[in-house]
Amino acid sequence: KATSINSYIAAINQFCQAMHWNDLCIKTIKVQRTAFEPEERELTMQEYKRLVTVAIRQNNLKTAMLLQTLAGTGIRVGELRYINVDCLEYGVADVYNKGKVRRILLPSALQKLLKEYVQNQDIKIGAVFQNRHHQPMDRREVWSRLKAIAALANVSSVKVYPHNLRHLFARE
């Protein structure tokens, strides 16, 4: 792969510069990056709505809320723990990731749904999405929930993963 070769070239170039052999540095290979997912991996709005509908019909409200939160806010799966009971009051979550703070706005419809969800689930403090030990859900549980609902909704599992819901948010 060109990107792997470029990594080696960068390492060699750094060594050459450290040794003051600047004339030995070589150019990296130009790589054309694709801006979008291949169409066969792109989740459509229709498929997303089917996932949510099936989750609700299966009485799997946690998965339905999870889908709507990931798609409605564009957050990363690792940032889900910052969606907590306190932030539902103001509709804003401060996410600390990669050394930065980002302010996530919760759409009012999602905010209302999440408030109802935490009330029905008797979640008083902490993360909205908790495991059975009242700890924030980890990425493995999120993935398994999404794959399970994809099978029930007859949506290709190749298309259903947390980051693809982030892309859906960016496209809509």
Regions found by a protein language model. Name each.
Residues 1-172:
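Conserved catalytic core of the tyrosine transesterase superfamily
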